Amino acid sequence: MMESYWPAVARGDEEAPPAMREWAVKLEAKPKYVVSSTRKDFPWTNSHPIAGDLRTSVQKLKDATPDGVLLGSGKLATELDRLDLIDEYKLLVHPRISGHGPTLYESGLARTRRLELISAKPLRSGAVAMHYRRAR
């Protein structure tokens, strides 16, 4: 999992290119907010559980974090989108087609979301980094 890999890279316990190590050190210093109904232990540095009502807790976090909150879970993204709590999407599209595996909104959404393109940047790998804002 990320919580064991990135701290090891930051400490130098895992082999990694310098740019990855630099990213790991920055990530280690950042606050991390965890949504879980089962976990009680959060060993990663600066980890904080989000408890109680998800809508209220995430809205408070958004209000307290004007630069934004990054999330990394398809299930959480689906639920936050359902609660209308996602303002922007940053997507990285790789030049591969997978005929199997999970999709971002595997269980679907209640309605269509209109998005406005903020930026699209092709990367050397062939992937495209795209930034969208919700059209309201």
Predicted regions and their residues:
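Enzymes that bind and transform nitrogen-containing heteroaromatic metabolites
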Residues: 1-136
